[in-house]
């Protein structure tokens, strides 16, 4: 009887809990999907700002996001 109870508890309670998707996982997945939709210029801008690097700009168009070449 005890073995049947353990098997039923495992199948009816523990197995469904292990297969549920956590709510904390979903925003990360959505965030990654949103990043794939960016155009290459926006993606490069985000990567460069994260690395703390700036691009080289041609002299009349210099601004804070890049340095003059």
From Swiss-Prot:
The keyword Secreted applies. Residues 1-24 form the signal peptide. The keyword Transcription does not apply. InterPro entries: Conotoxin. Keywords: Cleavage on pair of basic residues, Disulfide bond, Secreted, Signal, Toxin. GO terms for cellular component: extracellular region. GO terms for molecular function: ion channel inhibitor activity; toxin activity. Disulfide bonds join 56-68, 57-66, 62-69. Residues 25-53 form a propeptide. It comes from the Eukaryota. It is found in: Secreted. Expressed by the venom duct. Its main location: secreted. Belongs to the conotoxin M superfamily. The cysteine framework is III (CC-C-C-CC). Classified in the M-1 branch, since 1 residue stands between the fourth and the fifth cysteine residues. This is Conotoxin Lt3.3. It comes from Conus litteratus.
């Amino acid at each position: 009887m005890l073995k049947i109870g353990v098997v039923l508890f495992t199948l009816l309670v523990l197995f469904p809990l292990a297969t549920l998707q956590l709510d904390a996982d979903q925003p990360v997945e959505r965030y990654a999907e949103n990043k794939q939709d960016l155009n290459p210029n926006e993606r490069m801008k985000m990567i460069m700002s994260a690395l703390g690097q700036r691009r080289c700009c041609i002299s009349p168009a210099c601004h804070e996001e890049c340095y003059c070449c």
